[in-house]
From Swiss-Prot:
Enzyme class per UniProt: oxidoreductase
Gene assigned in the entry: leuB
Native species: Nitrobacter winogradskyi (strain ATCC 25391 / DSM 10237 / CIP 104748 / NCIMB 11846 / Nb-255)
Essential cofactor(s): Mg(2+); Mn(2+)
Protein name: 3-isopropylmalate dehydrogenase
Any GO MF annotation of the entry: NAD binding
Family the UniProt entry places it in: Belongs to the isocitrate and isopropylmalate dehydrogenases family. LeuB type 1 subfamily.
Length: 370
């Protein structure tokens, strides 16, 4: 049986609490002989700053580079608002993404039947929703140069951000999206703004070329990103996999997040290239939610997004889709029984703590393996 090297970076706020439930799950899988893990733990964010005056140490970064997958909790909080900008807690996550060369961000939006009433949309619109947004993570307007603010000398200033994409950046993110679509419902929607942006013209052109060369079996649709946002709210189940750039991906994935009813439910994966020597893809997995310092240490945090992020690691880093499917089923079963953390509480539901939710999911997984 293969041994998977896993680096756990709990971070700040509720990060350690939700990561504790991953440790519980990993321990159970190990004890049952279902999967074998070699786990290490490190500091990141404010916790790292408090200990070492940096948001992530070189030693922890070396562990991340050596791991098969990195599991990340959350960083930040008011405690560190006044620390120097270059060592702010969030800089630790940015360095991880940069040094691991993670360019593909995967954000699933799944609405479990038991939570359809929690969405702001009608239950029939979101029940059974299962879409994947693939966001390009290292290019575009967030990283393009020049990026300046110029004083024009007449009481006016001019701010400039630059949207830049090269062909190879679009090709590689398109391949990730097409490969995912092939394993799902064989449908990909590419979103850009080719009607007003030259990068949108190139994006449309390159995605079309990749489709024609390599993925003719996948149904490809092009859509303007603003229209896509509208359609996500109007009838989200029309989509399967959506691929888009950094800026639009940031916006569209947040729109999709709220279709599900709670940020506490949503995992994410950030993937790099596959090493041709080891055939391993560098990857970082994290919940979409933040550090929520206002509820930290109270047992109120929802661990499902963190556990589902580990599920994505099982699927994309460890090639254990069988286990990932069972974990998803266990989460759905627990929710169907009416167990809810505080963020999901509703009439008739049983409100449970962070650890009680994690324990219930592991017990359900145990029943599925019986």
């Amino acid at each position: 049986m293969a041994t998977y090297k896993l680096l756990l970076l709990p971070g700040d706020g509720i990060g350690p609490e939700v990561m504790a439930e991953v440790k519980r799950l990993v321990g159970w899988l190990d004890a049952q002989g279902i999967a074998k893990f070699e786990t290490e733990e490190g500091l990141v964010g404010g916790a790292s700053y408090d200990a070492d005056k940096v948001s992530i140490t070189d030693a922890t970064m070396a562990k991340a580079l050596a791991a098969d997958a990195v599991l990340f909790g959350a960083v930040g909080g008011p405690k560190w608002d006044s620390v120097p900008y270059e060592v702010r807690p969030e800089a630790g996550l940015l360095r991880l993404r940069k040094d691991l060369a993670l360019y593909a961000n995967l954000r699933p939006a799944i609405c479990y039947p038991a939570l359809a009433e929690s969405s702001s949309l009608k239950p029939e619109v979101v029940e059974g929703l299962d879409i994947m947004i693939v966001r390009e993570l290292t290019g575009g307007v967030y990283f393009g140069e020049p990026k300046t603010v110029t004083d024009l000398g007449n009481g006016q200033k001019r701010a400039v951000d630059t949207q830049v994409y090269d062909t190879y950046e679009i090709e590689r993110i398109a391949r990730v999206a097409f490969d995912l679509a092939r394993k799902r419902r064989n449908k990909l929607t590419s979103m850009e703004k080719r009607n007003v942006m030259k990068t949108g013209v190139l994006w449309h052109e390159v995605v079309t070329q990749v489709h024609q060369r390599e993925y003719k079996d996948v149904a490809l649709q092009h859509q303007l990103a603003d229209s896509g946002g509208m359609q996500l709210v109007r009838w989200p189940k029309q989509f399967d996999v959506i691929v888009t750039d950094n800026l639009f991906g940031d916006m569209l994935s947040d729109i999709a997040a709220m279709l599900t009813g709670s940020l506490g439910m949503l995992p994410s994966a950030s993937l790099g290239d596959t090493d041709p020597k080891t055939e391993k893809r560098r990857a970082l997995y994290e919940p979409v939610h933040g550090s929520a310092p206002d509820i930290a240490g109270q047992g109120l945090a929802n661990p499902i997004a963190m556990l589902a992020s580990f599920g994505m690691a099982l699927r994309y880093s460890f090639d254990r889709g069988d286990l990932a499917d069972k974990l998803d089923a266990a989460i759905a079963a627990v929710l169907a029984k009416g167990l809810r953390t505080a963020d999901l509480k509703s009439e008739g539901a049983t409100v449970v703590s962070t650890s009680q939710m994690g324990e219930a999911i592991v017990k359900e997984l145990e029943a599925l393996h019986a």
